Each structure stands twice: as C-alpha cells, then as structure tokens.
Design a protein with these regions (language model features):
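Flexible inter-domain linker/hinge segments
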Residues: 218, 226, 289-299
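Intrinsically disordered, low-complexity Pro/Gly/Ser/Thr-rich segments with frequent PxxP/GP/PP motifs
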Residues: 213-257, 263-264, 271
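Extended substrate-binding grooves/exosites of carbohydrate-active enzymes
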Residues: 1-199, 203-210, 215-225
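Terminal connector regions
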Residues: 248-294
Length: 299
C-alpha cells in the first residue's frame, strides 16, 4: 500500500504540470511486485507520457531502458542488438559522475548519442555541490560537508556530496567547460586542410545556423594570427553543410598552424550577449613544407 499511495499522490499532485514529461517510479529501490503494480496503475491513468524505473532494467515495468553508469561498449551492444531486437530507448538516469577531476570520457558517450538513434543520452550526476561555506578560526573560508557537522566520528560519506558541475554558490568547476564543449549544438569537421574546407553539422532542433556568426582564425605556432575572418552559414536544423574558407599560405617562419572556429549569436537573447561563445573547434593544419629554421645570431 505504501508504494501505491506514494505513486498515486505523486501523479495527482503533478499530472497537470507542463514540466513533467516522464514519470519515475523511484530510485535505487530494487524491483519487484510493488513496482510492477505501481507501473500497471500508472499505465491505466497515463496515456501520453512514458514511465521509467531504472531498477526494472529490461523487465516489462519500464518504458525506457535507463540503467545508470553504463560503459560506451554496453551502449553500443544494446543499440546493435538484433535477437531480440530492442525497442525501448536507452537513456541513462545517471552517468558521468561529476566529482573531482571528471568528465574526461564525455566525447566518447556523445559520439554514441549522436550516431545511434535508440541511445538517446543521459543525466549527469549532478549539477551542484551540496556543501556549505564556513569560516575557520583564522578568518579563512572553506567548504564543509558530511562529517564536519554533528558529533565526532559521526557516520558520513565524506565529500561524496560534492560532485557537481558547479560549486555550492554556482561557480563553475573546470569540467563544466568540458560538458559545454561536448554538448555544443554546432560541430565542425575539417575535411580538406589545403583549402580549409569544413563540414558543419547543425544539431539545433529549431534554429538555423544563420542565427550565429562563425569567426575563424589561422594561428601560427608563434601565436600570431596569419589569417582570419567571419562567415554567416545557412544550415537548417539537423542539416550538414560544406563551407570552404580558402587556402592560406603560411609564412616560412611558421612550422605548423591551427584553425580556430568560434560561434557567437547575431542577436542578444536572455542570458546570452552577442559576444558569448556558444561553440568552438580547433584543428591542427598540415605542416609547412616551406618552413625554414630561423637563423641564430650570436652576439
């Protein structure tokens, strides 16, 4: 009865809220007849929104296969399974645990999300550190957590609650920039280094890329800008277009160079100014065949 009461109260409380797009039966509580019955009840009253439960795995009482912290290899095995053929989308309820120096494997996950339609993403655990700012005896502030409160030797998971992309006052941790890069909606591939030809993919669902300005630079290994420019790109949502920037001759004192791309909005929008970078890429260009080692002058 307790499981059913909680599920029914949740549904009645939130059924008309526009922010509810998926229902969850619970978190990390095993599976069994209680969750089968609550799933059955939810399906009897809910006709449009999916219902998921992570611990159901591939049993019948979940509309989404949503196991947490699966490897890239497991995602691919699921996506390519044919006997029996899978039909439920794979959306990890948690992945990429954002504690400490984390986020380094995100690109490999994004490659799967963008190439396997049935593997549809996941939820990073989590957004913000659960900690407090305190002042020590010397007047210096520090973050507190877990066993910093309560009697000595109180049971605690230590700093395990400090696993966010931002700290407790919403200042970004370094790995938030990794997430921004991986999640950017404009992605370029350099297909011809000689003529600086790019394939540009627009991952936006509703926005044409002409809402943004492409800023490009060719920068030498000495840090100087060799060539630069801006470009407006017309690409419908989910389209891929080819853009040629043109050949750039490298000076003889440049051994190698890099192509930097940066995208900014044409018009300001809430929270985003026209100088805000929404996406970027960098490519190493071919080595300079005309490079000459600078002469060393002895004084």
């Amino acid at each position: 009865p307790a499981h059913m009461d909680r599920t029914q109260r949740m549904y009645e409380r939130a059924k008309n809220h526009p922010g509810i797009v998926i229902w969850s039966l619970g978190n990390e509580a095993g599976n069994g007849i209680n969750f089968e019955r609550t799933y059955d009840w939810m399906k009897s009253v809910e006709t449009t929104r999916p219902i998921q439960y992570e611990r159901a795995e591939q049993n019948y009482n979940t509309d989404i296969y949503c196991r947490m912290y699966r490897s890239v290899e497991e995602l691919l095995v699921y996506a390519r399974q044919t006997e029996p053929k899978v039909y439920r989308p794979f959306i990890m309820t948690e992945y990429l645990h954002a504690m400490g120096n984390s986020g380094g494997g995100l690109k490999e996950y994004m490659d799967v999300f963008e190439t396997e339609p049935i593997v549809q993403g996941g939820c990073i655990w989590d957004w913000v550190d659960q900690s407090f700012r305190e002042i020590d005896a010397d007047g210096r502030w520090y973050w507190t957590y877990g066993g910093d409160y309560g009697p000595k030797n109180v049971p605690s998971f230590g700093n395990f609650c400090c696993n966010g992309l931002v700290n407790a006052v919403r200042e970004p941790h370094p790995h938030l920039l990794e997430v921004k890069k991986a999640y950017q909606y404009i992605k370029a591939t350099l297909v011809d280094k000689s003529n600086l030809t790019l394939n540009i993919k627009n991952w936006y669902d509703f926005t044409n890329l002409n809402a943004y300005i492409l800023h490009w630079q060719v920068v030498g290994d000495h840090g100087k800008v060799i060539a630069d420019g801006t470009r407006r790109v017309d690409a419908a949502p989910h389209a891929t277009v080819e853009v040629m920037l043109g050949a750039v001759r490298l000076p003889s004192d440049v051994r190698e160079a890099y192509l930097n791309l940066s995208w900014t909005p044409v018009d300001a929008a809430p929270f985003i100014n026209t100088d805000y970078e929404v996406a970027y890429d960098q490519f190493v260009l071919s080595g300079n065949k005309n490079y000459r080692t600078p002469e060393t002058k002895l004084s």
